[in-house]
Structures are given as structure tokens and as C-alpha cells.
Amino acid sequence: MEEEKASAAQSLIDVVNEIAAISDYRITVKKLCYNLARRLKLLVPMFEEIRESNEPISEDTLKTLMNLKEAMCSAKDYLKFCSQGSKIYLVMEREQVTSKLMEVSVKLEQSLSQIPYEELDISDEVREQVELVLSQFRRAKGRVDVSDDELYEDLQSLCNKSSDVDAYQPVLERVAKKLHLMEIPDLAQESVALHEMVASSGGDVGENIEEMAMVLKMIKDFVQTEDDNGEEQKVGVNSRSNGQTSTAASQKIPVIPDDFRCPISLEMMRDPVIVSSGQTYERTCIEKWIEGGHSTCPKTQQALTSTTLTPNYVLRSLIAQWCEANDIEPPKPPSSLRPRKVSSFSSPAEANKIEDLMWRLAYGNPEDQRSAAGEIRLLAKRNADNRVAIAEAGAIPLLVGLLSTPDSRIQEHSVTALLNLSICENNKGAIVSAGAIPGIVQVLKKGSMEARENAAATLFSLSVIDENKVTIGALGAIPPLVVLLNEGTQRGKKDAATALFNLCIYQGNKGKAIRAGVIPTLTRLLTEPGSGMVDEALAILAILSSHPEGKAIIGSSDAVPSLVEFIRTGSPRNRENAAAVLVHLCSGDPQHLVEAQKLGLMGPLIDLAGNGTDRGKRKAAQLLERISRLAEQQKETAVSQPEEEAEPTHPESTTEAADT
């Protein structure tokens, strides 16, 4: 049963990890899906404590855990569909989508309610967290709305009309923008999603599928018309400037070589990248393909052994040379990378500079990217307005992409630029949404020392948001932070410590830090006054001592003498943190309290109770109460023991023994 319990708990953790790996959701259901995924992630600490516990569980309890797994798998399938499914379907069939979400939520609530928590060896903090999740599922009942009414009505109006694009251009434009179907790769992915729905259901997905296909065709025609109009206007302007007719100009445009076209979009590539099969694609197109759940090369159908995309600088240079030779404007960056209007807070000169930097980041050679990332790093450090402007210009996804570059200097500039941008609260969410955490963790593991320090500082900045604490911990940031705390420079240790402190506020990260070996490092830093890390070490220990594993390891590390000394001579903050650690150590374990008393705890403790910080006074009062209780117990024991020993002794025998 012990193995079955551990296996069940691990399988639940695996399901949550699969849910956490779902990177994004369709815009119409994004908030609902993120809320559902966030609640499920909060259950991980319970599963970890069940897995690591030595206490056996009954067969009935094991069944309730497996029922929860079944409910979570249903939630995972629902979230996958909301990530990869048809955007049009999610709006037009909103009642079904709502009903399915309610069904999933009810199933999760019922499964969680059936678990006999009193039989599980889990901490009070984790139990409270599970109860919070359960209450959130209960409150969420009947409050589901997956799309706005205007979008739904627009789609219905398109279904009820003819397929004449010109007649419904305002509606089509509104729908295409709201559903993010303004680019050819997005339209291709939507088409694939509709086809996969048909295939998975045996060709029968309801009466509305034909209407959805018709609406998609109307949107495609509208987008194509818009693109054609844009090209005609561009050609017309160029030809008028040369004193020629647009017809003559168009006749001069040469045929684009096939090697310059993306095999997916058939358009000239603007940001060519190589996949593991050796084929080259437009970056945005192949990213959409991979994000859609495909694991094969679109052209060769070979399995992709890696999702790494390598910039094809040679082809990019050839395309630029061909454009110049044929007097054609080089291809603009894709919309996601194209420099957007820079914030009005920046000066015109800085606005132009930022746009140029975006171009160099996206399309420059390594030397251009290195200098551009370095300049963005400095601009973002300078003031708040620049941080807003740089983010609005689209720098964040470009910088995230450069975190994986083999060039250590580009890597260092990029992670530091993200650190400076993260000072702006609104940028924190954008950085995490851009998928920055895995790249930052990789820099933290293998970057230069300065890059590692700045990666740690970036994680600290991002972890200010509670949801990010869960994400950062789940993506493996804690072990390399512990390594940096142990072997980094003075600044690196400080950055690692502040990040670890923030992350360990979340209960689920405490066990990760403890298992990564942070406590021996922290206790060593306590005994090295010259390290300048005493404040940070005590603050983290105060958090970790509330965890059962943490309490046990601290208790076995001979930390009590140091804690008593800090209560006696430390700063106000160190005194309160040392007292907080001691409170946890002495809870249910009087030997530490006895040791502390022998070391002269009482005097400093009374002083702390009268002159410490508010928290310090509370902790001192708790310790004094425990000391008082222990003294009473010792007194009762001392009184009862002589009576028990005196009973078999008689006066005669005592005298006799004395005479002898």
C-alpha cells in the first residue's frame, strides 16, 4: 500500500505538471482557464507531502485520490481544448463550453470533498490551502461567462448572412481582431483546429460546424483582401514616386525564389529559422505549428527531436541581398515582432532609437543583437518611461528569445534588460507570459557569474506576484538558486537569498528548497559573521522552520546556540527571526528549550518581550509561555518521583542500614 500511495501521489503531481505546461489559452476563455489551472497547481504541496509521508493510508483513501486524479485528467483535457481548440467554436458553442467547465469544476469539488484529510499526514498549512481551493471551486459555481455578447452576436449575424465579404467588413474586422485571426498562421491554425474536431468526432460535431467553416472562410477572404489592398497601396506609392503606373511597377516585381518562401505560409520569410529536421520556416508560422501540439516537421513529416529554433542568418542575408538587387523593400518583421508605436512618454529621439533597437534585436547578426540588448539594458535602467516604451515596442519576447543564445554576453545583456524592465509592475506579467522563466532558469544554471546574479535578481522581482511564485518554483528555479547562494559572489548570494525568501513564502516551495540542501548553507552562513548574510539566512530559516522537514534539519544542525546569541545581541529584525525559529524548534520538542535555557535564554527573552518589534514581542511571549509550561511539568515530575521512591522504604530498614 505504501508504494501505491507514493505512486498515486506522483501521478497526481504529473497531471498538474502537464497542466502547468499548457502555455496559453484562447482569448475568450483565458481568464477562466488560468483560474482553473492556478487552483489545481495549489494542490501540489498536498500531493508532495502525501508522497513523502511514511504514514500508511487505507484502501478507501487511496480510491478517493484516484477519483481526484480522474477529475483532474478531465480538467486537463478541457484546458488542452481551450488552448488548442477552435476559437470560433469556443464562442459560438459557449453554452456547451460553459456546461463542460461547470461539469469539470463540480467533479473536482466532489473529489476533493470526499478525501478524508484527517487520515493523511499533511501539515496544517497545506490543509488550509486545500480548503481554500475547495472554497474557490464552490464559489465559482454559477458564475461562468466565457465570451462577450457582442462577439457572440457578431458571429451569429455572419452565420445568418451570405458570404459576401464586402457587405460585412466592419463586423468581420471586429471579429478577426477579437479572435486574433488577422495573420495567415493564425488562420491556418484555426482551420486545423476545426478539421481536428471533425476528425476526432467521426465527422459529426453538431449542426453548426458548416456555419463555423463558412465564417472562417469569410474571415480569410477579408484578411486576404486587406493584405492585397495594403500591397496595392504600397506599389502605387512607389510607382507614383518613380513617375510610373502601378501596372508597370507590378510587372517589374520578379518572382520570389521558392527557397525564400515559408513552406507553411508560402510568403517570403522575414525571420527564417531552422528546425531539428533541417528545414527552414518563418518563425511565427512554425511556432504556431508547434504550439498547436504538432511534433513533426510540416514538410517532411519527420519527428522533431527538439523544439529549438535556430536563426538562419545565411538565408536572411541572401533574402536581404536579393531584395536589394531587385530594388524591393526588405520584408518587414512579423506583427508580433514589428516595432509598435512607442509610448508618448519617450522623447522622439528615444522613440526612433527604440524602434531601431527592436529591428536589430529581431534581425541583426549576433554583434547587432549584442549591442542592441546592451543599449536596451541601459535605457530600461534609466527611467520608468523608458521601461514602458520598450515593453510597448515589443522588446520582451525578443529578449526572452535571446536567453537561449550561446553568446554569453548577449545572454547577460538580455537577462539584465528583463530585470530592469520588470521594475515596472505591468511588465512582470508580460515577461512571465512571454515564457521567460525557463530561459532565466537556464541562465541561472549555466550563464556567466554576472548573468547568474542578474537572473536571480529577476526571479526575485517576478516573484513579488503570488502566482509567479508557483510558476517559478514549478519550473526548477530553486535548486540553482541554492547553488548560487552557496558558491556565488557576495552580490550573487544576496540576490539568491532574496529570491529564495520570496519563493519560500509559498508553502509548496518550502519542500523544494529544503530538498535542494538550503538549510546547511543557511546555518553555515549564520556562523560566518564576515559573510554579511546573517540577516537573509535568519529570515529564510524563520520561514522554513514552519515546515516539518525544515524543523527536523534545523534541529539536528546544532543551531540553538547561535539562535540564543542572536536573541541576545542581534539587530531587532534578527532577534525576532531567531525567536521565530526557536518557537518552531521548541514546539513539541522540549529538549531544545532546555538547551536554550542552559545557554542563558531567559534574560534576553524577557528583554525582547518588553523592547522588541511587535512580532519579536509575540515570539518572545510564546517562548516564555512554553518555558513556564515546561517548568510546571518538571515541578510536577519532581514532586511525584520522591513519593514513588519513598513508598517501599521503612524506618527500621533505614536505621538498620545506617548502623551497618
UniProtKB/Swiss-Prot annotation:
The keyword Zinc-finger does not apply. Residues 236-250, 651-660 have a biased composition (Polar residues). GO terms for biological process: cell surface receptor signaling pathway; defense response to bacterium; negative regulation of apoptotic process; negative regulation of immune response; protein ubiquitination; regulation of photoperiodism, flowering. Binds to SD11, SD16, SD17, SD18, SD113, SD129 and SD25. Phosphorylated by SD1-6 and SD1-7. Pathway: Protein modification; protein ubiquitination. It catalyses: S-ubiquitinyl-[E2 ubiquitin-conjugating enzyme]-L-cysteine + [acceptor protein]-L-lysine = [E2 ubiquitin-conjugating enzyme]-L-cysteine + N(6)-ubiquitinyl-[acceptor protein]-L-lysine. Transmembrane segments: none annotated. The lineage of its organism: Eukaryota, Viridiplantae, Streptophyta, Embryophyta, Tracheophyta. It comes from Arabidopsis thaliana (Mouse-ear cress). ARM repeats lie at residues 384-423, 425-464, 466-505, 507-546, 548-587. This is U-box domain-containing protein 13. InterPro entries: Adaptor_Cbl_N_dom_sf, ARM-like, ARM-type_fold, Armadillo, RING-Ubox_PUB, Ubox_domain, Znf_RING/FYVE/PHD. Its EC number is 2.3.2.27.
